[in-house]
C-alpha cells in the first residue's frame, strides 16, 4: 500500500495511490501530477546516519565508522514533495543526499536484530540536504550542516513494508536538472536496517512514526538556486524539490 496526504480545497485528505491515481477516504480521485502534497504522515523523531555507505566516507576524506554515526534532524527541517528547499545565504556548498527512510511502526527498546524488521511499518524517500561548509569542523555532529528549515524533504508516499521485498537490494539515484549525479544501492550500507534498529533501541525507545534516514552513497555535488533535485529509490518512489534562495 502507498499512502500519503494532500491539501485539497483547504482540507487535508489522506490518499492511497492505486493504478496511477490518488483516492481519498471519500473515494474521490485526484491527479498525482496536480496534487498539493503534504508530508505522507506526521513524523515523530528523525534520526540520521552519517557515513553509512561504502565509499562515501572516502569521498569526504574520512574513515569508515566502526559503529553507526547518528544525528537528529529538527521537525522544522521537514518538507513535502515539490516544496522548495531554501539555500542559506552566504554558504559555499549545498548538496543533496538521496536516502531510503525507514518508518517505525511498533514501539520497542532493546530490540534484537532478528526481530528488528517486525518494528518497521514501511519506507519513504528522503533528501538529507546538507551545507558542506559546516561538516568536518566544530559543527560536527552536523546540527548546523543538516538542521536548517526545509533540509529534510520526505515523501511523497509511505510505502508499506510488505511492498518492498528486500530493502537491502534497492537502487538509489539523484538527479539535478535531469542529470544523473548520484547512484548507488542499499546493499552498500555498512550497517543494515536490523543493525541500525537494534543499535538505536539499545539506549532509547523507538516509537511509531519515528523516521530513520539510512545514509547516502557517494556522488555528492553542489546545487544552486534554480536547480531541481530529484531523488529516486527503487520500489519506493520519486521525491522532487526545487532550490530557491533563502527568504529573509
Explain the meaning of each model-derived region.
Residues 56, 64, 132-248:
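Catalytic-pocket segment enriched in acidic/His residues
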Residues 97-127:
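RNA pseudouridine synthases
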Residues 64-81, 96, 230-234:
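Structural signature of FAD isoalloxazine-binding scaffolds in flavoprotein oxidoreductases
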Residues 36-38, 59-60, 85-94, 108-115, ...:
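A generic local secondary-structure boundary/capping motif
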Residues 48, 95-97, 207, 224-225:
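Residue-level recognition of short, solvent-exposed, well-ordered loop/turn junctions
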Residues 1-68, 162-165, 173, 179-180, ...:
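N-terminal non-catalytic cap/leader segment that marks the start of a structured domain
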Residues 30-35, 64-65, 79-91, 138-139:
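Short acidic (Asp/Glu) patches
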Amino acid at each position: 500500500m502507498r499512502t500519503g496526504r494532500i491539501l485539497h480545497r483547504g482540507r487535508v485528505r489522506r490518499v492511497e495511490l492505486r493504478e496511477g491515481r490518488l483516492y481519498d477516504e471519500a473515494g474521490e480521485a485526484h491527479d498525482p501530477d496536480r496534487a498539493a502534497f503534504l508530508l505522507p504522515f506526521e513524523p515523530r523523531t528523525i534520526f540520521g546516519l552519517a557515513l553509512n555507505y561504502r565509499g562515501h566516507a572516502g569521498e569526504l576524506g574520512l574513515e569508515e565508522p566502526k559503529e553507526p554515526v547518528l544525528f537528529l534532524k529538527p521537525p522544522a527541517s521537514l518538507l513535502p514533495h515539490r516544496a522548495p528547499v531554501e539555500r542559506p545565504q552566504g554558504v559555499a556548498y549545498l548538496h543533496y543526499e538521496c536516502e531510503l527512510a525507514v518508518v517505525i511502526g511498533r514501539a520497542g527498546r532493546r530490540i534484537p536484530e532478528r526481530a528488528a524488521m517486525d518494528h518497521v511499518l514501511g519506507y519513504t524517500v528522503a533528501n538529507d540536504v546538507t551545507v558542506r561548509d559546516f561538516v568536518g569542523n566544530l559543527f560536527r555532529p552536523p546540527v548546523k550542516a543538516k538542521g536548517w528549515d526545509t533540509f529534510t524533504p520526505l515523501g511523497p508516499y509511505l510505502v508499506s513494508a510488505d511492498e518492498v521485498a528486500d530493502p537491502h537490494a534497492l537502487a538509489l539515484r539523484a538527479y539535478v536538472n535531469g542529470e544523473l549525479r548520484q547512484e548507488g544501492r542499499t546493499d552498500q550500507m555498512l550497517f543494515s536496517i536490523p543493525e541500525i534498529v537494534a543499535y538505536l533501541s539499545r539506549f532509547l525507545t523507538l516509537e511509531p512514526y519515528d523516521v530513520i534516514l539510512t545514509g547516502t552513497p557517494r556522488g555528492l555535488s553542489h546545487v544552486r538556486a534554480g536547480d531541481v533535485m530529484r531523488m529516486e529509490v527503487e520500489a519506493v518512489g520519486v521525491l522532487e524539490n526545487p532550490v530557491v534562495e533563502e527568504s529573509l
